[in-house]
């Protein structure tokens, strides 16, 4: 999980959970079904061009709106390596770690363009824009939160701890 490389899919400010996964799909909790509809209201052709391992880059307040775990689950299951944004809605932030979706706060998202290739080093806290030869730093993810990501989310982390006899 430490170093990931992929293409950028750029979105704007205030991308709410209804744009990530529309409310009409909330009658299912099947991650594959959710993933098959991710971002379709924001960009109908998104999944036709998206490749697993790519990144979503956005502005302020990504994941605002209603509190639904479906949104980070849909992104993670679709294969989004990480969401990189200037800021995140707090409940989306927490739900993302709980479901194992990496999210990174970076102030320079305006410098990153659609189609750029990024290399993200989770351990070093750096993002290299290989297209533009620029490097951006992000606040390192706290150790416990990294454990959640590496385990695949809070439930998988708890299962592993129980299996180890720690919980």
Swiss-Prot record:
UniProt feature coiled coil, ranges: none
GO BP terms, alphabetized: L-leucine biosynthetic process
SUPFAM superfamilies documented for this protein: LeuD/IlvD-like (SSF52016)
Keywords assigned by UniProt, alphabetized: Amino-acid biosynthesis, Branched-chain amino acid biosynthesis, Leucine biosynthesis, Lyase
Keyword S-adenosyl-L-methionine: no
Reaction catalysed by this enzyme: (2R,3S)-3-isopropylmalate = (2S)-2-isopropylmalate
EC number: 4.2.1.33
GO molecular function, one term: 3-isopropylmalate dehydratase activity
InterPro entries, per the entry: Aconitase/3IPM_dehydase_swvl, AconitaseA/IPMdHydase_ssu_swvl, IPMI_Swivel, LeuD, LeuD_type2/HacB/DmdB
Superkingdom of the organism of origin: Bacteria
Name of the top EC class for this enzyme: lyase
Pathway: Amino-acid biosynthesis; L-leucine biosynthesis; L-leucine from 3-methyl-2-oxobutanoate: step 2/4
Pfam family name, one: Aconitase_C
Subunit structure: Heterodimer of LeuC and LeuD.
HAMAP family attached to this UniProt entry: LeuD_type2
Function according to Swiss-Prot or TrEMBL: Catalyzes the isomerization between 2-isopropylmalate and 3-isopropylmalate, via the formation of 2-isopropylmaleate.
Family from the record: Belongs to the LeuD family. LeuD type 2 subfamily.
Record-given protein name: 3-isopropylmalate dehydratase small subunit
